[in-house]
A protein has these predicted regions:
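Proprotein-processing/basic-patch segments
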Residues: 19, 110-155
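Predominantly extracellular/luminal cell-surface or secreted proteins
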Residues: 2, 27, 47, 60-69, ...
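Beta-strand-rich interaction/scaffold domains
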Residues: 48-121, 139
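A short beta-strand-loop element at or near the start of a globular domain
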Residues: 1-50
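Hydrophobic beta-strand residues in large extracellular and virion-surface proteins
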Residues: 24-27, 39-46, 60-63, 98-100, ...
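Generic structural motif
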Residues: 29-33, 47-51, 65-68, 103, ...
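Intrinsically disordered, compositionally biased repeat/linker segments
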Residues: 152-194
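Short, surface-exposed beta-strand/loop "edge" segments at domain boundaries and coil↔beta transitions
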Residues: 18, 52-54, 69-71, 128-142, ...
Length: 194
């Protein structure tokens, strides 16, 4: 689906929370490709350099982006939107693959799913950590590349055309523009997204 070529999070050598590093990852075209889709899983393949600690319980903190491009005209902190969640693992001189879905990393998956389905293409790494004068913060990480692969289905319904059932995509007119409908059905009193 898309790749990004590097981002940092955390603090180094006496950094205050206000100067904690911000990593911006732009996945060109992801927003347009995923808008209105029903995402089933998101796989992140993350390559990290040997920065910070080699802990296997390091946390990457993923946030929404306030800009859907790399905006070099603003401070890094201005790029940081709402926190979506964390991913725990070893992010030190390695490549690791993490799959997010409804049963694995469910909270982060739900947040990223909604974010990408809304047409967004940029992820931000930011944890607001501070550091001592001589070292790294506990979750300092430098991601040198990140690739996302997304499994999704189109938002479709079935309609009857004479005696034949056909798969249909439903659209409606909103303020002069066509918008795709996301279908739901009622199951025992609860609305379930198709």
């Amino acid at each position: 689906m898309g790749s990004s070529s590097g981002a940092c999070q955390g603090a180094y050598q006496g950094t205050t929370a206000a100067k904690s590093r911000v990593g911006v990852m732009v996945f060109s075209g992801a927003g347009a490709a995923l808008k209105g889709k029903l995402i089933q899983s998101i796989t992140l393949t993350i390559t990290s350099s040997g920065a910070g600690s080699g802990s296997s319980s390091k946390k990457l903190t993923f946030c929404q982006a306030n800009y859907q491009s790399l905006n070099t005209g603003v401070r890094g902190s201005t790029q940081v939107g709402a926190t979506m969640g964390t991913l725990t693992g070893k992010f030190y001189s390695n490549t690791a693959t993490h799959t997010l879905n409804a049963s694995s990393n469910a909270a982060l998956f739900a947040a990223m799913k909604a974010y990408f389905e809304a047409g967004n293409s940029v992820l931000v790494l930011y944890n607001g950590e501070t550091s001592s004068s001589s070292g790294y913060s506990s979750n300092y990480a430098r991601v040198t590349s990140c690739t996302i692969s997304v499994t999704y289905i189109d938002a479709v319904v079935w309609c009857r055309d004479g005696s034949t059932w056909r798969q249909c995509t439903v659209w409606y007119r909103l303020n002069g523009a066509w918008a795709q409908v996301v279908p739901y059905y009622n199951s025992d009193g609860a609305w379930v997204r198709v």
